[in-house]
Amino acid sequence: LGWTPGRKDREKVEETIKEFSLQHLALRHTDELSGGELQRVHIARALVQEPQILILDEPTSSLDLKHQIEVMKLLRDISHQGITVIMAIHDLNLALRYADCFVLLKNGNILSMGGEEVITEENLQVLYDVRINRIDNGSHIYVVPEME
């Protein structure tokens, strides 16, 4: 193909490595990285390409709680830089802490779309076929499935 990275490409990579505090990982093979480290590397790799939109499928799956929070904070920071972040995520409590807009999909169709007001017990019961309690403590909203 004949393409090799130029000076600007290398500078952008170095800048992104520093921005994401990945210097200690730069020379390691990806099979040596933890799930959280690998996810940060994948996101950084995508950002080097300077996208306007970042589309992610379950970016926090298989991560421990610490790394889930790190990845979600990172994605929130990216969105504050003017990059649109669209993600599929099934952890509603995590989504409620970090997302600005929700699109609830059922069988490939939009069930509801909007802010946290669309996260209702009724919508979630239709969506998951499980009774769910929505708890608003004044500062955060939580969803908890009812146990039989």
Range-by-range predicted roles:
Residues 50:
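Conserved catalytic motifs of ABC-family nucleotide-binding domains
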